[in-house]
Amino acid sequence: MTVYTPTSERQAPATTHRQMWALGDYAAIAEELLAPLGPILVSTSGIRRGDRVLDVAAGSGNVSIPAAMAGAHVTASDLTPELLRRAQARAAAAGLELGWREANAEALPFSAGEFDAVLSTIGVMFAPRHQRTADELARVCRRGGKISTLNWTPEGFYGKLLSTIRPYRPTLPAGAPHEVWWGSEDYVSGLFRDHVSDIRTRRGSLTVDRFGCPDECRDYFKNFYGPAINAYRSIADSPECVATLDAEITELCREYLCDGVMQWEYLIFTARKC
Protein backbone atom coordinates (compact mmCIF):
# COMPACT_ATOMS: atom_id res chain seq x y z
CA MET A 1 0.00 0.00 0.00
CA THR A 2 1.24 3.47 -0.86
CA VAL A 3 0.96 5.75 2.14
CA TYR A 4 0.08 9.40 1.69
CA THR A 5 1.11 11.73 4.49
CA PRO A 6 -1.09 14.84 4.80
CA THR A 7 0.55 18.24 5.02
CA SER A 8 1.21 19.69 8.46
CA GLU A 9 -1.82 21.95 8.04
CA ARG A 10 -4.11 18.92 7.90
CA GLN A 11 -2.20 16.48 10.09
CA ALA A 12 -3.91 17.14 13.44
CA PRO A 13 -7.57 16.99 12.32
CA ALA A 14 -6.81 14.14 9.92
CA THR A 15 -5.12 12.14 12.66
CA THR A 16 -8.03 12.67 15.03
CA HIS A 17 -10.50 11.70 12.32
CA ARG A 18 -8.52 8.57 11.46
CA GLN A 19 -8.38 7.49 15.08
CA MET A 20 -12.14 7.89 15.50
CA TRP A 21 -12.91 5.63 12.54
CA ALA A 22 -10.50 3.03 13.88
CA LEU A 23 -12.65 2.72 17.02
CA GLY A 24 -15.06 -0.19 17.24
CA ASP A 25 -15.57 -2.12 14.00
CA TYR A 26 -17.02 0.04 11.26
CA ALA A 27 -16.00 -2.57 8.69
CA ALA A 28 -18.42 -5.00 10.33
CA ILE A 29 -21.24 -2.45 10.04
CA ALA A 30 -20.33 -1.76 6.42
CA GLU A 31 -20.25 -5.43 5.50
CA GLU A 32 -23.20 -6.66 7.58
CA LEU A 33 -25.61 -3.79 6.96
CA LEU A 34 -24.39 -1.37 4.29
CA ALA A 35 -23.00 -3.68 1.60
CA PRO A 36 -26.02 -3.33 -0.75
CA LEU A 37 -25.35 0.39 -1.14
CA GLY A 38 -22.12 -0.07 -3.11
CA PRO A 39 -23.60 -1.95 -6.06
CA ILE A 40 -26.49 0.54 -6.15
CA LEU A 41 -24.10 3.47 -6.64
CA VAL A 42 -21.95 1.57 -9.14
CA SER A 43 -25.02 0.71 -11.21
CA THR A 44 -26.50 4.22 -10.98
CA SER A 45 -23.15 5.68 -12.09
CA GLY A 46 -23.03 3.45 -15.17
CA ILE A 47 -19.57 2.11 -14.40
CA ARG A 48 -18.23 0.10 -17.34
CA ARG A 49 -15.31 -2.17 -18.12
CA GLY A 50 -12.11 -0.18 -18.47
CA ASP A 51 -13.31 2.91 -16.58
CA ARG A 52 -10.75 4.50 -14.28
CA VAL A 53 -12.64 4.74 -10.99
CA LEU A 54 -11.65 6.39 -7.72
CA ASP A 55 -13.54 5.38 -4.58
CA VAL A 56 -13.03 8.16 -2.03
CA ALA A 57 -13.38 7.30 1.67
CA ALA A 58 -13.67 3.71 0.49
CA GLY A 59 -13.86 2.12 3.92
CA SER A 60 -13.87 -1.66 3.60
CA GLY A 61 -14.60 -1.59 -0.13
CA ASN A 62 -18.36 -1.56 -0.59
CA VAL A 63 -18.04 0.51 -3.78
CA SER A 64 -14.53 -0.48 -4.84
CA ILE A 65 -15.20 -4.19 -5.02
CA PRO A 66 -18.40 -4.12 -7.12
CA ALA A 67 -16.80 -1.50 -9.41
CA ALA A 68 -13.84 -3.84 -9.94
CA MET A 69 -16.24 -6.72 -10.54
CA ALA A 70 -17.79 -4.59 -13.30
CA GLY A 71 -14.39 -4.51 -14.98
CA ALA A 72 -13.27 -1.02 -13.93
CA HIS A 73 -9.71 -0.12 -13.01
CA VAL A 74 -10.32 0.90 -9.40
CA THR A 75 -8.29 2.87 -6.91
CA ALA A 76 -9.63 2.78 -3.35
CA SER A 77 -8.58 5.60 -1.03
CA ASP A 78 -9.31 6.10 2.64
CA LEU A 79 -7.89 7.99 5.59
CA THR A 80 -8.00 4.93 7.86
CA PRO A 81 -5.46 2.18 7.09
CA GLU A 82 -7.33 -0.35 9.22
CA LEU A 83 -10.32 -0.09 6.90
CA LEU A 84 -8.19 -0.26 3.76
CA ARG A 85 -6.56 -3.45 5.01
CA ARG A 86 -10.02 -4.95 5.47
CA ALA A 87 -10.92 -3.91 1.93
CA GLN A 88 -7.72 -5.43 0.59
CA ALA A 89 -8.53 -8.74 2.25
CA ARG A 90 -12.05 -8.75 0.80
CA ALA A 91 -10.76 -7.94 -2.68
CA ALA A 92 -8.09 -10.65 -2.47
CA ALA A 93 -10.70 -13.20 -1.39
CA ALA A 94 -12.74 -12.27 -4.47
CA GLY A 95 -9.69 -12.55 -6.74
CA LEU A 96 -9.74 -8.86 -7.64
CA GLU A 97 -6.84 -6.48 -8.23
CA LEU A 98 -7.29 -2.87 -7.13
CA GLY A 99 -5.04 0.07 -6.36
CA TRP A 100 -4.89 1.21 -2.74
CA ARG A 101 -4.04 4.63 -1.37
CA GLU A 102 -4.18 6.01 2.15
CA ALA A 103 -5.40 9.55 1.57
CA ASN A 104 -7.33 12.49 2.97
CA ALA A 105 -10.47 13.33 0.95
CA GLU A 106 -9.66 17.01 1.47
CA ALA A 107 -6.25 16.66 -0.22
CA LEU A 108 -6.33 13.78 -2.68
CA PRO A 109 -2.85 12.75 -3.93
CA PHE A 110 -3.93 12.35 -7.56
CA SER A 111 -3.53 14.40 -10.72
CA ALA A 112 -6.26 16.61 -12.15
CA GLY A 113 -8.57 14.66 -14.44
CA GLU A 114 -6.99 11.32 -13.57
CA PHE A 115 -10.27 9.38 -13.27
CA ASP A 116 -13.32 8.72 -15.43
CA ALA A 117 -15.54 8.41 -12.37
CA VAL A 118 -15.18 9.51 -8.75
CA LEU A 119 -17.51 7.79 -6.30
CA SER A 120 -18.18 7.78 -2.57
CA THR A 121 -20.75 5.94 -0.48
CA ILE A 122 -21.29 7.07 3.12
CA GLY A 123 -17.74 8.40 3.07
CA VAL A 124 -16.90 11.95 2.01
CA MET A 125 -19.83 13.26 4.03
CA PHE A 126 -17.67 12.84 7.13
CA ALA A 127 -14.77 15.00 5.91
CA PRO A 128 -14.94 18.19 8.02
CA ARG A 129 -14.47 20.69 5.18
CA HIS A 130 -17.25 20.01 2.72
CA GLN A 131 -16.42 22.52 0.00
CA ARG A 132 -12.76 21.56 -0.06
CA THR A 133 -13.76 17.91 -0.32
CA ALA A 134 -16.20 18.55 -3.17
CA ASP A 135 -13.56 20.60 -4.98
CA GLU A 136 -11.11 17.70 -4.69
CA LEU A 137 -13.58 15.16 -6.06
CA ALA A 138 -14.19 17.45 -9.02
CA ARG A 139 -10.49 18.17 -9.56
CA VAL A 140 -9.44 14.54 -10.00
CA CYS A 141 -12.37 13.71 -12.32
CA ARG A 142 -11.85 14.24 -16.05
CA ARG A 143 -14.10 16.54 -18.05
CA GLY A 144 -17.22 14.64 -19.00
CA GLY A 145 -16.59 12.14 -16.23
CA LYS A 146 -19.08 11.13 -13.55
CA ILE A 147 -19.11 12.27 -9.92
CA SER A 148 -21.46 10.24 -7.73
CA THR A 149 -22.13 10.15 -4.01
CA LEU A 150 -24.55 8.29 -1.76
CA ASN A 151 -25.15 9.80 1.67
CA TRP A 152 -27.60 9.58 4.55
CA THR A 153 -30.41 12.14 4.50
CA PRO A 154 -30.98 14.47 7.47
CA GLU A 155 -34.55 13.19 7.81
CA GLY A 156 -33.77 9.46 7.81
CA PHE A 157 -32.80 7.17 10.67
CA TYR A 158 -29.06 7.37 10.20
CA GLY A 159 -29.12 11.12 9.71
CA LYS A 160 -31.05 11.51 12.95
CA LEU A 161 -28.63 9.14 14.70
CA LEU A 162 -25.72 11.35 13.66
CA SER A 163 -27.59 14.44 14.87
CA THR A 164 -28.31 12.74 18.19
CA ILE A 165 -24.69 11.90 18.97
CA ARG A 166 -23.17 15.04 17.44
CA PRO A 167 -23.43 17.24 20.59
CA TYR A 168 -21.43 14.63 22.50
CA ARG A 169 -18.57 14.28 20.00
CA PRO A 170 -15.48 16.17 21.25
CA THR A 171 -13.34 15.60 18.14
CA LEU A 172 -15.45 17.64 15.71
CA PRO A 173 -13.53 20.71 14.48
CA ALA A 174 -15.04 23.99 15.65
CA GLY A 175 -17.61 25.20 13.17
CA ALA A 176 -17.58 22.00 11.13
CA PRO A 177 -20.72 21.73 8.97
CA HIS A 178 -23.07 18.85 9.71
CA GLU A 179 -22.21 15.70 7.77
CA VAL A 180 -25.85 14.96 6.98
CA TRP A 181 -26.08 18.09 4.83
CA TRP A 182 -24.51 15.95 2.09
CA GLY A 183 -27.85 14.14 2.06
CA SER A 184 -29.75 17.32 1.15
CA GLU A 185 -30.40 17.82 -2.58
CA ASP A 186 -29.87 21.59 -2.56
CA TYR A 187 -26.80 21.48 -0.36
CA VAL A 188 -24.83 18.81 -2.20
CA SER A 189 -25.77 20.33 -5.56
CA GLY A 190 -24.47 23.67 -4.30
CA LEU A 191 -21.13 22.16 -3.33
CA PHE A 192 -20.51 21.09 -6.94
CA ARG A 193 -22.32 23.89 -8.79
CA ASP A 194 -19.11 25.43 -10.20
CA HIS A 195 -17.78 22.10 -11.48
CA VAL A 196 -20.59 20.04 -12.97
CA SER A 197 -23.64 19.79 -15.21
CA ASP A 198 -26.47 17.28 -15.59
CA ILE A 199 -27.10 17.07 -11.84
CA ARG A 200 -29.47 14.32 -10.81
CA THR A 201 -30.61 13.25 -7.36
CA ARG A 202 -32.91 10.58 -6.03
CA ARG A 203 -33.76 9.16 -2.64
CA GLY A 204 -33.89 5.52 -1.68
CA SER A 205 -33.90 3.45 1.47
CA LEU A 206 -31.84 0.56 2.77
CA THR A 207 -33.87 -2.21 4.39
CA VAL A 208 -32.24 -3.43 7.60
CA ASP A 209 -33.57 -6.48 9.45
CA ARG A 210 -30.69 -6.94 11.88
CA PHE A 211 -32.29 -5.80 15.17
CA GLY A 212 -34.96 -7.47 17.27
CA CYS A 213 -35.56 -4.57 19.65
CA PRO A 214 -34.55 -0.91 20.18
CA ASP A 215 -32.02 -1.77 22.90
CA GLU A 216 -30.22 -4.18 20.57
CA CYS A 217 -30.04 -1.49 17.90
CA ARG A 218 -28.67 1.07 20.36
CA ASP A 219 -26.05 -1.31 21.74
CA TYR A 220 -24.89 -2.25 18.25
CA PHE A 221 -23.94 1.33 17.46
CA LYS A 222 -22.66 1.91 20.97
CA ASN A 223 -20.21 -0.99 20.64
CA PHE A 224 -19.23 -0.93 16.97
CA TYR A 225 -19.69 2.57 15.49
CA GLY A 226 -16.67 4.86 15.86
CA PRO A 227 -18.52 8.20 16.15
CA ALA A 228 -20.88 6.73 18.77
CA ILE A 229 -17.99 5.24 20.72
CA ASN A 230 -16.26 8.62 20.54
CA ALA A 231 -19.39 10.29 21.93
CA TYR A 232 -19.83 7.83 24.78
CA ARG A 233 -16.16 8.07 25.76
CA SER A 234 -16.51 11.83 26.08
CA ILE A 235 -19.26 11.43 28.71
CA ALA A 236 -18.00 8.28 30.43
CA ASP A 237 -17.52 10.16 33.71
CA SER A 238 -21.14 11.35 33.72
CA PRO A 239 -23.66 8.54 34.31
CA GLU A 240 -26.46 11.05 33.83
CA CYS A 241 -25.24 12.02 30.37
CA VAL A 242 -24.74 8.38 29.42
CA ALA A 243 -28.29 7.58 30.50
CA THR A 244 -29.62 10.53 28.51
CA LEU A 245 -27.80 9.52 25.34
CA ASP A 246 -28.88 5.90 25.83
CA ALA A 247 -32.50 7.01 26.07
CA GLU A 248 -32.25 9.27 23.02
CA ILE A 249 -30.77 6.57 20.79
CA THR A 250 -33.17 3.93 22.10
CA GLU A 251 -36.16 6.13 21.32
CA LEU A 252 -34.83 6.83 17.83
CA CYS A 253 -34.41 3.11 17.18
CA ARG A 254 -37.94 2.48 18.47
CA GLU A 255 -39.30 5.12 16.08
CA TYR A 256 -37.84 3.38 13.03
CA LEU A 257 -38.02 -0.29 14.03
CA CYS A 258 -41.23 -1.96 12.83
CA ASP A 259 -41.64 -5.73 13.24
CA GLY A 260 -37.87 -6.17 13.22
CA VAL A 261 -37.32 -4.09 10.07
CA MET A 262 -35.90 -0.59 9.62
CA GLN A 263 -35.70 1.69 6.58
CA TRP A 264 -32.60 3.91 6.37
CA GLU A 265 -33.06 6.73 3.86
CA TYR A 266 -30.21 7.89 1.62
CA LEU A 267 -29.68 10.37 -1.23
CA ILE A 268 -27.86 9.56 -4.47
CA PHE A 269 -26.23 12.50 -6.27
CA THR A 270 -24.77 12.16 -9.77
CA ALA A 271 -23.35 14.78 -12.13
CA ARG A 272 -21.03 15.26 -15.10
CA LYS A 273 -17.77 17.16 -14.70
CA CYS A 274 -17.73 20.26 -16.90
Swiss-Prot record:
The keyword tRNA-binding belongs to this UniProt entry's keyword annotation: no
Q: Provide a Gene Ontology MF annotation, just one.
A: methyltransferase activity
Q: Which SUPFAM superfamilies does this one have? A: S-adenosyl-L-methionine-dependent methyltransferases (SSF53335)
Claim: Signal is one of the keywords in the record: yes
Which Cys residues form disulphide pairs?
A: none
Q: Which UniProt keywords apply?
A: Signal
InterPro entries registered for this protein in UniProt: Methyltransf_25, SAM-dependent_MTases_sf
Signal peptide positions are 1-30
PANTHER family noted in UniProt:
2-METHOXY-6-POLYPRENYL-1,4-BENZOQUINOL METHYLASE, MITOCHONDRIAL, METHYLTRANSFERASE
Its family remark reads:
To M.tuberculosis Rv1405c.
Q: What is this protein called?
A: Uncharacterized protein Mb1438c
Source organism per entry reads Mycobacterium bovis (strain ATCC BAA-935 / AF2122/97)
